[in-house]
Amino acid sequence: MDEITYDRVQEESNPKVKQLYWDIAFGLQDVDGLKPSQYMKDLSEEHISGKKTYVQVQNEITSYYSKNKDNHEDNDEEEADEVATAIYEILSDKSFRFDFLTLKNYHKRLFINLDKEKYNPGNFRNYNFTKDEPVLKGDTVQYQSYDLIEETLKYDFNEEKDIDYSKFSEEELIDRITEFTSRIWQVHPFQEGNTRTTAVFIQKYLISMGFNINNELFKDNALYFRNALVRANYTNYSVGAKETKKYLNMFFENLLLNKNNDLNKDDLKI
């Protein structure tokens, strides 16, 4: 009997796919108001055209910031460049396992080359925090307590594993994906980078289930996605605000069902 062999996964060669992955990687930095450097953009163009491999781009961007630590003052550009490079790698990687450990691994890969004290890559936070949200007029979402992070994620992931999306209507599908995404984001397990980590994980999860998704939404609407998550987890009756998943549903309808909902960031303000 002929032995069935494994095929080693090769680096993505399609320029259009590479362009899309870089666009998403750059676009997701918008959730924190970050923009990639011109140097990073130039490297990505060389990669898309086939002049450089991904490994060469990765090594060059890491070397660039290592050599210029003392002279480089724009830490925002460094973060955008390093994280975008890692996001490209994860999106182009064909492997995936549905587990909260994968979520931790993605966070580690995104932030491993940045300030260890600030990002604590791949580790759950060990303190509680708040974050002033412009969309909430400076108020904060109530995130999960740090001592319940792992227990909560285990529960949410185990519950999600039992879901059979093949039995769902389109409306049920959107509601469930929205609910799961909202839950893991509300936990906010990491010190920094929760939205970008969540966005990458959800994209990989949906692709692993065979859904055809409009990835360009993450390229163009990253800040809307983040603010929709905020509104899905915020209630304050004193200002007439109740948590609503309407905006997140609209995002996922466009992502999964190719609808054309108007994703206007201003609509999310309370």
Question: Across the structure, where does each feature detected by a protein language model lie?
Answer:
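FIC/Doc superfamily catalytic core
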Residues: 1-270
